[in-house]
Amino acid sequence: MIAAPLDAVAGSKGKKPFYSHLYVQVLVAIAAGILLGHFYPELGTQLKPLGDAFIKLVKMIIAPVIFLTVATGIAGMSDLQKVGRVAGKAMLYFLTFSTLALIIGLIVANVVQPGAGMNIDPASLDPAAVATFAAKAHEQSIVGFLTNIIPTTIVGAFADGDILQVLFFSVLFGIALAMVGEKGEQVVNFLNSLTAPVFKLVAILMKAAPIGAFGAMAFTIGKYGVGSIANLAMLIGTFYITSLLFVFIVLGAVARYNGFSIVALLRYIKEELLLVLGTSSSEAALPGLMNKMEKAGCKRSVVGLVIPTGYSFNLDGTNIYMTLAALFIAQATGIHLSWGDQILLLLVAMLSSKGAAGITGAGFITLAATLSVVPSVPVAGMALILGIDRFMSECRALTNLVGNAVATIVVARWENELDTVQLAAALGGQTGEDTSAAGLQPAE
């Protein structure tokens, strides 16, 4: 194993100093980015390429990670019917909790009413400010989304880094390998061997995470300023608190029912959470999350199917945001929505949140798609939250990430593909600390 000499050296030197852990470095980088962006905003905005470059580095390796994990996982299945079962159970879980997240956002908006009393005239809003997002939303459709899952070419799917297209091909290729049996054994062995250097490459790329988080946070604070939060603090606070309650109460209850602690899980994936906080991109944590879930005892085939699919279909944070933001706009502009209007909003959001998945700025675009179908709420009202959306995107991404981690463990347990002893050891901190960085290796 490549990591053996490194582990031996680490063991001989005793416990690592705290500052050598990735999560500490990312946390310091985020704090430094906030300070620099606040006191030197012009310099902060110029550091955007650092964050963009890191995201591109991670996206570069996502397709190989998904392909190797899914193809080898399915190829090793003795019962191919399991593939359909895992996918079906995952989609059932996604639909249930995505809908629940939408309903919770709707209820909270009605109870708290964060937009009440603003009395903004809809005619005074500038539709040009959100025209780009509205145009992108109109380009999306459910049929277009589903047909786009099928890649035009295999190379094109990998070149574009489209998660669902890569997943689609990987599943088919894994099934084909399983069906040819011994004839495909050499290919499976080769792919298994290729997994080690690919995950080592992920570990190398993760060392740049503090730089990416620093640049992204400096840009955000430098461009939008901490002061821009104050005017709409009620909406931001309501969204953050609702998301926290969803994670600790709803997902916490799911975790407890399935035999693990949500707090222990959050501690286990802390590096990935801080990475998302710094970059505002849940994709940045995808390779590390897949590796962590496999190390936690979830079968590779389950991890490979649930997490990439969940990145498009299990967006709990985005769903809470959509109904909450839609009702905020209605309240701010003095538009009364009947329960019938709100149910229509809920049904449209259930569809549009899937149809616009995987797009940059997906949360804002899916909101535009939803409002364009619901005539009661003006799409131009999105201009009210355009300036603060960037501050809510981190919370959306964090909630989405936790939701997918929980979903993976739950589906693995439903399929009897979860090593509970390994899960307990991982969540108890017995698998080593910095597994998303220097210690990252594919689980056996």
UniProtKB/Swiss-Prot annotation:
Any one GO molecular function term: malate:proton symporter activity
GO biological process: L-aspartate transmembrane transport
Principal subcellular localization: membrane
Subcellular location: Cell inner membrane
GO CC entries: plasma membrane
Keywords linked to the UniProt accession: Cell inner membrane, Cell membrane, Membrane, Symport, Transmembrane, Transmembrane helix, Transport
Regions that span the bilayer: 18-40, 53-75, 90-112, 142-159, 163-180, 201-222, 232-254, 327-349, 364-386
Domain of life the protein comes from: Bacteria
Protein topology in the membrane: Multi-pass membrane protein
PROSITE patterns for this protein: NA_DICARBOXYL_SYMP_1 (PS00713), NA_DICARBOXYL_SYMP_2 (PS00714)
Function field: Responsible for the transport of dicarboxylates such as succinate, fumarate, and malate from the periplasm across the inner membrane. This transport system plays an important role in the energy supply of rhizobium-legume symbionts.
Family: Belongs to the dicarboxylate/amino acid:cation symporter (DAACS) (TC 2.A.23) family.
Protein's UniProt name: C4-dicarboxylate transport protein
Organism: Rhizobium leguminosarum
